[in-house]
Structure formats: structure tokens, C-alpha cells
């Protein structure tokens, strides 16, 4: 019994270092917000200007690696002996659901404004050229390239799960073929896992930092409650308490139902925006943007603006590549888990086609709506951002639609549910990763899950206290640096092991 109890408890070598590192960083930030902002700006500038090229090359190499998987010797290899667990339609729907977080709703509604007001390639701000390239860049940042990267890592994790029958809850578990049993279970593995978990907890905190202002701004619009940092903190606290109640009372089925509601409501809300904002314009703008993407793709892939030094690729492309890198392992583990029984080619094609369609629909509909509101002078986005902040500007793009009250209620419910499910997923992932063995069908300890949800909430509040998008962007970029190397190691470990166990026939 003692042994069983010990096995299901926390794993000290990853739990305590993570807790200490995150605690110290939060304390130093809160202690002096002005000094923290200076450090944040310095870190952002250093990483994006000195190492931005590495992120761009990584994405390009992973794109070619995707083609190797799809057309290479492993294309017809099956990931597990069983038939696919889910139908193709359900599988794609689950992938779409994973794309409808509140953070995605945040960027989808406002990103195009930044691209138009500070465009790439030396274009004039707010010019026709800037508007033509605006959506094309969104399709680039949220299109086949990053999903190809995820599909490769998903194949790697599915291989370790279903072919090699490994119990993978942390990235170090996959590194035995690359570094050997001794290093994969020693100090090296502890360092790798802590890099992964520190980056992941800050990534989750940034998502919460993006989502919370949307909910509080909705509350201000609907109920007239002023949006303050204190209200943000109260909302985050309520989410944490709600998550704790769900976990303690065994209401995980309710959380899963809420996740399904989020997916259906996302379809409904996107369909509403598509119809009432101008379906014809949206389709024309999308078609034109795909052409712009294909025409400028080579330059977008390698654009660093080393001569012009306008800062666009550093502020956006490098930031988004770091965003994709930092979530890669968590998302790939989830996508691998739902892909049991599929071939390598099926998984790669299904992910790239299904997930690209999902993100392209989101960005096209929401971005086109924002552009139309700006062009028709219905909204003054720059003024809204300057006077009230980015979240208010996003809320106003939804409030400007017909049946504004019903629309805002729908958006409020969508953001609220998306954030509840985010915190639930955060606490579950972190608890699983910082505990010893948790057998199939078992849940990680309640107090550990609640503890991590509290810490994620604190990080979200700290980032909100710093103000603006730069702290959020810097947290992602700084976290993406160590995971950049972890992702490469997982990829190389898969390739090395597959050569032995998936011998060419």
C-alpha cells in the first residue's frame, strides 16, 4: 500500500524545481513592475533579433520533414495494431475543437489590424498593399507550416505510445533511444522536463492573460461593471474555484460536455459573423489572400528584415513560431492520443488539412469582419486600443454586428467556457507531468491539480498587471527557446528508434 501511495504522489525532481523557479520569477516581477518591463523588452529584443533566424529555419526544416513522412518509407506504417478509435469526421471535429480557445478568438479578431497598421516589406501603413498582405500573413502564421510541424511530433508521440508501448507523460520519456537509459532517467531528463514545464506553465499563463480581459470586457458591455485589474483577478479566482469544484466532485464529464458546447457554439458564432458581415467580401478577400500567400511564400519563410529593420518578422513571425514551438509537445501528445490506429500518412494529411481549414476559417471570418468595420469607419480601432485597450477593441468588433446583445451573450459564453476548459486542461497536464505514475483510468491528485491551477492563475494576473501585449509576447518567446531544443531532441529520438523498429520492407 505504501508503495502504491508513493507511486501516485508528486515527483520531487520536477515538482519542486518548477514550483521554485516559477515562484521566484513571479515574485521578482511583482516586486518591481517597471524594472520587469525593462527586462522584458531587453529579452524580447535579444531573442527575436539574435535568434529569430533559428526559429524560421526550424519551421522550414520541419516542413520538408513532413513531406518525408508523407511520401517516405514510413507513410503506410500504422500507429498501433487497432482500428482507428474515432471516425474520420469525429477525429477532425476534435481537432477543430482544440483550435477554438479564447486566445485564438483574441488574435483572430485583432491581428489583422496590427498587420495593416505596421505592415511588412516596407509597405505604407493602412495602404491597399498592406490590406492585401494582411490576411495572407495570418494564413501564413496559422496555416499548413505550423500544423506540418505538429503532425511530425504527433507521429513521434503516437509511435512511442502505440508502437513502442511507452508510458509517455513527459518529453524525457521519449529520449531513451537518443541519449540512453542512464541520461534519460538522470539529471539530463530532469533538466529537459523542467525546461518543458516552466515554458508550458508560462504559455498557459499567457493564454489566461489573453482570455481574461475578453470576459471582463464582455461583462462591462453586458452589465456595466467597470473593467479593472481587480475584476480580472476576481474572474480568474472564480474560474480556479469552479475548476476545483469540478475536479473534487467528479464533474469531469460536465467539463467534457462544456468543451463540446464550446465547439458547437464556435461554429454558430462564426457562421453568424460570416453571414451578417459580408459573405461575398469574405470569400473574395480569402481567395485573394491565398494568391498573395502563394506569391510571397518564399520571402515570408525567410523574412528577417535584416536591412530595413522594421521589426515585423521579429514581432510577429518569430513570436508566432515560438508560440507554436511552446505548445508543440502538449498539443502533439493530445493529437497523438486521438490518432491511434491511423497510418502515418493519414495522420499527417488529416492534421494539416483539417487543422489548416479550422484556423483559416477562424482567421478569415474574424479578420475580414474587423477590416470591414475599419474600412466603413464603423470602428476606430487605434483610438479604442489607445483609450481602452486591445480587449475592448476586440469586443467592439463583435458588438458592431446585428443583434448585438445576443451576439455579445454568445461571445461571452464562448470565452467563459473556453477559459474554464483551458484551466481544467492546464491543471490536468501539469499535475500529470509532475506526479509519479498515474495509471490508465486514474486521475492525478486533487491538491496537485488545484495547486497548479492557482499558479497558472497567478501568472495570468502578473502578466495582466504588467500591461500590454509585449509581456505576453516575451513570455512566449523566452519559453520557446528551451523547447526549441527539446522538440528537436524528441524528433531525432523518433527518427533513430524508427530506423530500428520500422525497418524498410
Swiss-Prot record:
One of its GO terms (molecular function) is (R)-carnitine:4-(trimethylammonio)butanoate antiporter activity. It holds the Pfam family BCCT. Pathway: Amine and polyamine metabolism; carnitine metabolism. Keywords: Antiport, Cell inner membrane, Cell membrane, Membrane, Transmembrane, Transmembrane helix, Transport. It catalyses: 4-(trimethylamino)butanoate(in) + (R)-carnitine(out) = 4-(trimethylamino)butanoate(out) + (R)-carnitine(in). One of its GO terms (biological process) is 4-(trimethylammonio)butanoate transport. InterPro entries: BCCT_CS, BCCT_transptr, BCCT_transptr_CaiT. The chain crosses the membrane at residues 10-30, 51-71, 92-112, 143-163, 195-215, 231-251, 263-283, 316-336, 347-367, 403-423, 446-466, 475-495. It is found in: Cell inner membrane. The keyword Transport applies. Its main location: membrane. It is a multi-pass membrane protein. One of its GO terms (cellular component) is plasma membrane. Belongs to the BCCT transporter (TC 2.A.15) family. CaiT subfamily. Catalyzes the exchange of L-carnitine for gamma-butyrobetaine. HAMAP family: CaiT. Homotrimer. This is L-carnitine/gamma-butyrobetaine antiporter. It comes from Salmonella typhi. The lineage of its organism: Bacteria, Pseudomonadati, Pseudomonadota, Gammaproteobacteria, Enterobacterales. The gene is caiT.
Amino acid at each position: 500500500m505504501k508503495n502504491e501511495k508513493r507511486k501516485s504522489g508528486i515527483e520531487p525532481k520536477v515538482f519542486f524545481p518548477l514550483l521554485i523557479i516559477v515562484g521566484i520569477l513571479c515574485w521578482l516581477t511583482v516586486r518591481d513592475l517597471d524594472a520587469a518591463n525593462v527586462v522584458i523588452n531587453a529579452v524580447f529584443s535579444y531573442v527575436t533579433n539574435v535568434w529569430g533566424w533559428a526559429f524560421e529555419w526550424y519551421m522550414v526544416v520541419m516542413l520538408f520533414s513532413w513531406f518525408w513522412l508523407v511520401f517516405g518509407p514510413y507513410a503506410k506504417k500504422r500507429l498501433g495494431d487497432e482500428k482507428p478509435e474515432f471516425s474520420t469526421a469525429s477525429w477532425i471535429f476534435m481537432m477543430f475543437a482544440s483550435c477554438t480557445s479564447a486566445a485564438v478568438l483574441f488574435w483572430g479578431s485583432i491581428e489583422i489590424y496590427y498587420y495593416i497598421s505596421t505592415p511588412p516589406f516596407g509597405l505604407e501603413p493602412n495602404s491597399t498593399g498592406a490590406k492585401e498582405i494582411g490576411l495572407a500573413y495570418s494564413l501564413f502564421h496559422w496555416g499548413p507550416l505550423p500544423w506540418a510541424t505538429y503532425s511530425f511530433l504527433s507521429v513521434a508521440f503516437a509511435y512511442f505510445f502505440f508502437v513502442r508501448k511507452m508510458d509517455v507523460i513527459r518529453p524525457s520519456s521519449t529520449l531513451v533511444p537518443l541519449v540512453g537509459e542512464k541520461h534519460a532517467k538522470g539529471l539530463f531528463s530532469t533538466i529537459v522536463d523542467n525546461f518543458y514545464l516552466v515554458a508550458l506553465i508560462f504559455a498557459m499563463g499567457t493564454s489566461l492573460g489573453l482570455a481574461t480581459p475578453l470576459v471582463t470586457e464582455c461583462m462591462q458591455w453586458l452589465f456595466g461593471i467597470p473593467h479593472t485589474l481587480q475584476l480580472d483577478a476576481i474572474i480568474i479566482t472564480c474560474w480556479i474555484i469552479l475548476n476545483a469544484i469540478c475536479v473534487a466532485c467528479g464533474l469531469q464529464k460536465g467539463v467534457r460536455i462544456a468543451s463540446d458546447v464550446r465547439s458547437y457554439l464556435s461554429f454558430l458564432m462564426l457562421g453568424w459573423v460570416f453571414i451578417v458581415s459580408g459573405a461575398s467580401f469574405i470569400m473574395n478577400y480569402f481567395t485573394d489572400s491565398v494568391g498573395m500567400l502563394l506569391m510571397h511564400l518564399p520571402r515570408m519563410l525567410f523574412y528577417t528584415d535584416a536591412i530595413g529593420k522594421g521589426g515585423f518578422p521579429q514581432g510577429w513571425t518569430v513570436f508566432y513560431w515560438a508560440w507554436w514551438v511552446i505548445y508543440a509537445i502538449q498539443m502533439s501528445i493530445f493529437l497523438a492520443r486521438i490518432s491511434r490506429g491511423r497510418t502515418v500518412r493519414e495522420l499527417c494529411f488529416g492534421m494539416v488539412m483539417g487543422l489548416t481549414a479550422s484556423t483559416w476559417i477562424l482567421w478569415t471570418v474574424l479578420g475580414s469582419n474587423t477590416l470591414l468595420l475599419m474600412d466603413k469607419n464603423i470602428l476606430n480601432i487605434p483610438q479604442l486600443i489607445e483609450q481602452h485597450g486591445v480587449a475592448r477593441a476586440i469586443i467592439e468588433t463583435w458588438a458592431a454586428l446585428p443583434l448585438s446583445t445576443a451576439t455579445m451573450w454568445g461571445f461571452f459564453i464562448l470565452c467563459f467556457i473556453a477559459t474554464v476548459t483551458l484551466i481544467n486542461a492546464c491543471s490536468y497536464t501539469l499535475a500529470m507531468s509532475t506526479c509519479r505514475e498515474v495509471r490508465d483510468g486514474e486521475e492525478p491528485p486533487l491538491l496537485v491539480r488545484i495547486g497548479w491551477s492557482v499558479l497558472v492563475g497567478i501568472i495570468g494576473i502578473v502578466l495582466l498587471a504588467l500591461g500590454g501585449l509585449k509581456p505576453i509576447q516575451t513570455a512566449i518567446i523566452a519559453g520557446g527557446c528551451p523547447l526549441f531544443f527539446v522538440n528537436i531532441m524528441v524528433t531525432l529520438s523518433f527518427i533513430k528508434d524508427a530506423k530500428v523498429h520500422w525497418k524498410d520492407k
